[in-house]
Amino acid sequence: ISRSIKHRNAKLMLPCPIHLDLVVTMRALSSRNTQSNIVLRNEIDKIRLLFRKDRESYLCFYRILGFYPHNIQLYEQALLHKSTSVRSDKGRPLNNERLEFLGDAILDAIVGDIVYKRFEGKREGFLTNTRSKIVQRETLNKLAVEIGLDKLIKYSTRSSSHNSYMYGNAFEAFIGAIYLDQGY
C-alpha cells in the first residue's frame, strides 16, 4: 500500500502508510511561522511522552489544556492546597499560594484588556466593576469545576483550612502555572 503526499508541488510516494502526526511534523519543519512551531513543539512533546514514567499526569493535563506541559511540576503544585503537608527539598511548605498570586495578576490583566477593548468609551469605574464581576471567586470556582480541576486538587481532609474558594484559587494557580510553563 502506498500513500501519496503532496509537498510544495512535489509528489512523494511512500511504500507504506505513515502516521499522520509525522506528516504534520514534517509540514511544521518546512514552515517557519509561529503556528507551525507550536504544532512542532506539541508533536515533539508527544514523542517524549512515550518514554515518561508519569504519562498519566501529562495526559490528564493535556486533556484540560490542549497541549503537553513542559514543566509538569508547576501544574502539580498548582493543585496542592495549603492544607497538605508537602514540603520542598529545602523544607519549605509546597502549595499553590504563590502560583495563585501570579495567576490572579495575570487574569486581572487579561480580563482587563478584554473589558477595555470590548467596552470602548466606558468610564474607568464601569470597567473596574465589570472586570471584578468576571474574576470573582464564584465565577472562578465554576470554571475550575467545568474543566475538571475540582477532581484533581490535593488537600487534607483533616484540616479546617478549606474554604469555599479552593477551586477558584486552584484555577488561578493553574493560570500561573501556564504562564510560567509556556512563557510570556
Task: Name each model feature, range by range.
Residues 8-10:
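Short hydrophobic alpha-helical segments enriched in small aliphatic residues
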Residues 1-6:
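Short, low-complexity, intrinsically disordered N-terminal modules
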Residues 13:
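Nucleic-acid processing machinery
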Residues 19, 23, 27-184:
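RNase III-family endoribonuclease catalytic core
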